[in-house]
Curated annotation (Swiss-Prot):
Lineage: Eukaryota, Metazoa, Chordata, Craniata, Vertebrata
Protein name: Intraflagellar transport protein 57 homolog
Keyword Cytoplasm attached: yes
UniProt-listed Pfam families: IFT57
Family note: Belongs to the IFT57 family.
Phenotype on disruption: Fishes show ciliary defects. In retina, cilia are generated but not maintained, producing the absence of photoreceptor outer segments. A loss of cilia also occurs in auditory hair cells and olfactory sensory neurons. In all 3 sense organs, cilia defects are followed by degeneration of sensory cells.
Coiled-coil parts of chain: 158-186, 283-373
The encoding gene: ift57
GO cellular component: ciliary basal body; cilium; extracellular region; Golgi apparatus; intraciliary transport particle B; microtubule organizing center
Primary localization: cytoplasm
């Protein structure tokens, strides 16, 4: 099946139409007896193989139904094909069905994985191709539809009345025109002759100006205007025909309502029974799964507690991660300083400078020692000189004291 390059907005619903046609063709082949009764399967719904969010789906059941119907259709075409089982490999089943379809002349231009879901456009396409081949092998031919004859007597009467009404209107308008032309009509021949005479003359040298009086023109228009109105007379038969049609439609609606009322009541009863079954099944499932629900609630509460503990632990981990980042930053700084100091220690230039400085210090110390020795020697000589002077002065003082006593 070749994919369309441009798909219109109605292509979404084409699958529903294809499925309905497929179901009608399966009913023609009497699939209820040969497939449903044989495998103990419930009848298909109108949109069973349609893939849509508005239709309930069961991929496992739909794929099994697809494989069983496809196998039955292949056997109807005269090809031997074993009925697939639920435990068979889906890939092998799909591959066998597509190979048989190609053998029968069908076109397959999509991957086999499209059929594993059991629903969708490709599933409907494969089944439709197989059912067409089966109908062809059975020699089945569709008859032309027979359309019921429709009574059109009322419409014919209405059309005849309409034609009569229009003919009357035309006759009345013709009579009014003739009377108007006889009484107040214009002399068209004289006007035509005058116009031709003016056109045949030479072209005027100046622009012509109209000499018509506007007031007289308006009076003439007001006088002629009532005679130009067309009045269409209403036909009294129209509303009676419409009333008869309304009564006929009402009778048809009442008849159809009586026929459909029984089906609607039956449908309501079926829906009520189905709802009761669903509610009872729901209650049964609730009672069976009550302990699992309680366990689930306990597990949910434990999960919430574990989440709280995890959040607390994650908060501590975040704080420790921040501290670790700060310590790592400080460690990087220390490593950088150590590398700088190591590089400076491995360099010999500072050592040479230190040695030169030590040598210079030794020389300066020697010079200072010499200066200190000179200063000490000078100081010692000064002290000795001062001591000698003091001694001399003391001897002189002792010698002067006896002489003074003698006097």
């Amino acid at each position: 099946m070749a994919e369309e390059e441009e798909r219109g907005p109605g292509s979404v619903y084409q699958m529903f139409v294809l499925m309905e046609d497929l179901l009608d063709k399966l009913k023609v082949l009497d699939y209820e007896q040969h497939v449903l009764d044989k495998h103990n399967i419930k009848p298909l719904s109108r949109h069973y193989f349609v893939s849509s969010p508005h239709v309930l789906s069961n991929p496992g059941e739909q794929f099994y139904m697809f494989s069983v119907i496809a196998a039955w259709l292949i056997t109807l075409c005269g090809r031997p094909f074993d009925t697939p089982q639920e435990y068979d490999d889906p890939n092998a089943t799909v591959s066998n069905i597509l190979s048989e379809l190609r053998t029968l002349g069908g076109q397959v231009d999509f991957p086999p994985s499209k059929l594993k879901t059991g629903s969708g456009e490709h599933v409907c396409y494969v089944l439709d191709q197989l059912v067409e081949k089966a109908l062809k092998s059975k020699g089945f031919a569709w008859n032309r539809p027979l359309y019921p004859s429709v009574e059109v007597e009322d419409e014919c009467v209405q059309e005849d009345d309409a034609e009569l009404t229009l003919s009357k209107v035309e006759e009345e308008m013709t009579q009014e025109d003739e009377e108007y032309e006889e009484e107040d009509g214009l002399d068209l021949d004289a006007l035509k002759t005058r116009t031709n005479g003016e056109l045949s003359g030479s072209r005027p040298a100046v622009v012509l100006e109209s000499d018509v009086d506007a007031a007289e023109w308006n009076l003439e228009v007001e006088r002629v205007l009532p005679q130009l109105k067309v009045t269409i007379r209403t036909d009294n038969k129209d509303w009676r025909i419409h009333l008869d049609q309304m009564h006929q439609h009402q009778d048809g609606i009442n008849t159809s309502l009586q026929d459909a009322k029984g089906c609607l009541f039956k449908l309501r009863e079926d829906i009520s029974k189905t709802l009761e079954k669903v509610s009872s099944r729901e209650k049964y499932l609730n009672t069976q799964l009550e302990h699992l629900i309680s366990e689930y609630r306990q597990a949910q509460s434990q999960l919430n507690k574990v989440k709280e503990l995890y959040q607390q632990a994650s908060g501590g981990v975040t704080e420790r991660t921040r501290i670790l980042a700060e310590i790592s930053e400080e460690l990087d700084k220390v490593k950088q300083e150590m590398e700088e100091k190591g590089s400076s220690m491995s360099d010999g230039a500072p050592v040479v400078k230190i040695r030169q400085s030590l040598t210079k210090l030794k020389q300066e110390i020697e010079q200072m020692d010499v200066r200190m020795g000179v200063v000490e020697h000078t100081l010692l000589q000064a002290k000795l000189r001062e001591k000698n002077n003091m001694t001399r002065d003391m001897h002189a003082t002792h010698l002067l004291e006896p002489n003074a006593q003698a006097y």
